[in-house]
C-alpha cells in the first residue's frame, strides 16, 4: 500500500500550524496594543484581521494544494493541479471577530478566531478539490484529539460529498486542533499512522444509543465536560 510517510504528514501539519498560530498571535498582539472601543479602533482591528486571514490563509491554501497534488501523484492518477480555495471575505472576518467579541474581549479568543479562518482556507482547499475530482477523504487526527474529531475519524475513508460542508465550508474547524482532512484516489493509498478502525472501536464502545449520546460519553471520558 502506498503511504504518505508519517514524517511528511507531521511536517505538513506543523507548517499549517505555524501559519494558524502566527496569524492568531499577531492578532492578539494588535489587540493588546490598540484600543477597539471606538468605531475607528474596531474598524482598524477588522481590517487587520482581514489582512491576516488573507495573507496566512493563502499560505494554508497553497500548502494544502501541495499535499493534494502529492497524494494524486502517490496514487498514480492524472487530475488537474489543485486550486486554492478563496480565503475568508471581509464580511466573514467581521462576523467571526465581532461574534467572538459579544462573549469575550480576550485577545487570545479573538486571535484564535482569526487562526481558525486561516485553517479554514486550507481545509476548504482540500475539500473543494476532492469534490471536483471525486476523491475520498478522511479526517486524520493529530496530537491531542477531541471527542468530535474522534467521531469524525471513526468514519474512515469516505467519498467526498457536499454533505460535509456548511455554507461552502468544512463544518468542524476549532481552535487548538491539528486534525485535518487527507485525500486519496484509490484504496491502495493512505496516510501512515491513520487507523480508522481504532477510532471506530473507540466510538462504538462509547455509551449511548445515538451519536449525540456517544459523543457526550467520549467527552466525559476525555474530561471535556
Could you tell me what each predicted segment is?
Residues 1-174, 183-225:
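Domain-core detector
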